[in-house]
Amino acid sequence: MNQSYFNLLGNITWLWMNSSLHKEWSCELLARNVIPAIENEQYMLLIDNGIPIAYCSWADLNLETEVKYIKDINSLTPEEWQSGDRRWIIDWVAPFGHSQLLYKKMCQKYPDMIVRSIRFYPKQKELGKIAYFKGGKLDKKTAKKRFDTYQEELATALKNEFNFIKK
């Protein structure tokens, strides 16, 4: 680890401290969510005039790890961050209103990707939904088809995981 690693970790931590959602989270959770992203270079940090303004990280999961993640968003091990090709946003931190800029930059960097995230409702942090985002060059029809395929595979895996019985 070098000085730039610690500067990066400090910038991301500062954004977490300024996020109404993240500032309540533990240092252990920060380490679990941020260090693998840095080590695998699976993050984007936006800086304006030397000040960090937005950050996101992602993991590329296989279906099995995806099922595990859906059941417990804090379950990822460092090795699982690069276990497959099913991209999930792990963190999205834009406490100063730069979420659209971060989204635009991600769409430019990954123009052909489908990316999913678990979004939480501010007043009901235990309640979330799966959202998906498409890269800038992916048309809506193709993106929807790909997303529907991912969702069908995930639903089947979850059904098998929980041994649901069809009535």
Curated annotation (Swiss-Prot):
Any one GO CC term of the record: cytoplasm
Q: Mind listing the UniProt keywords for this protein, alphabetically? A: Acyltransferase, Cytolysis, Cytoplasm, Hemolysis, Transferase
Q: What is this protein called?
A: Leukotoxin-activating lysine-acyltransferase LktC serotype A1
| Record's catalysed reaction(s) | a fatty acyl-[ACP] + L-lysyl-[protein] = N(6)-(fatty acyl)-L-lysyl-[protein] + holo-[ACP] + H(+)
Q: Which domain of life does this protein belong to? A: Bacteria
- The active site is formed by H22, D91
Protein family (similarity comment): Belongs to the RTX toxin acyltransferase family.
